[in-house]
């Protein structure tokens, strides 16, 4: 039992995710098509009590929030080996969406295209590169933030987008080991402020 008169800080947070994923791979005429769907049920809960003393003025933060929503995803990726399997090209698309808000529920708002190439220079050395957009939800703390029991960020948040540009060399040391050196650039947008 906590004596609130003497309590300065108390924090309790829970993130519960129950997940389902189905994936299937098709192979035909040297092509490989990997497809899949996913579903998650998310529960987020936060209780924060914080007394902040600034120049003998007490600022009280007493916050409780519980959030439950569903996440969905679908993807497809097509790969093909060329030049006696020295070159592997791959392209794909993914969408993620959730029922947190109308904007986030539209799967067309969260399309993530990507392409990659891998070229074997020698039996042990290869050059790899990929370009793609990846999307992720904002932090649950931002999604679940409430004022006067209303989710104040619900209409302001969107998926965070990150464009990746990656290139590098991979060297196979043995059957079960490899070393890789890569350069990458990431460009983020949609981060909540």
Predicted ranges, named:
Residues 1-104, 120, 177-180:
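Face-selective signature of the C-terminal outer-membrane beta-barrel domain
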Residues 15-17, 69-71, 108-111, 160-163, ...:
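Membrane-spanning beta-strands of outer-membrane beta-barrel proteins
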Residues 18-22, 74-76, 113-115, 155, ...:
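Membrane-embedded beta-strands of outer-membrane beta-barrel proteins
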Residues 45-54, 124-165, 183-193:
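Surface-exposed extracellular loop regions of Gram-negative outer-membrane beta-barrel proteins
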Residues 65, 75-79, 100-102, 106-113, ...:
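Extended, folded domain segments that form the structural surfaces/walls around functional sites
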Residues 116, 168-172, 176:
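Outer-membrane beta-barrel "beta-signal"
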């Amino acid at each position: 039992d906590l004596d609130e008169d003497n309590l300065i800080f108390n924090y309790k947070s829970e993130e519960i995710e129950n997940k389902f994923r189905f994936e299937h791979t098709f192979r035909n005429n040297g092509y490989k098509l990997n497809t899949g769907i996913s579903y998650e049920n998310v529960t987020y809960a936060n209780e924060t009590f914080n007394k902040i003393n600034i120049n003998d003025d007490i600022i009280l933060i007493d916050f409780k929030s519980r959030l439950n929503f569903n996440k969905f995803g679908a993807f497809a990726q097509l790969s093909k080996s060329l030049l006696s399997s020295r070159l592997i090209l791959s392209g794909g698309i993914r969408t993620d969406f959730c029922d947190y808000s109308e904007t986030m529920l539209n799967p067309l708002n969260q399309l993530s295209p990507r392409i990659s190439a891998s070229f074997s220079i020698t039996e042990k050395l290869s050059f790899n590169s990929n370009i793609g957009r990846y999307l992720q939800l904002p932090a649950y703390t931002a999604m679940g933030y409430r004022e006067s029991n209303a989710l104040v960020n619900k209409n302001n948040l969107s998926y965070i987008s990150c464009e990746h540009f990656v290139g590098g060399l991979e060297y196979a040391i043995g059957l079960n080991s490899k070393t890789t050196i890569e350069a990458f650039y990431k460009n983020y947008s949609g981060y909540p402020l």
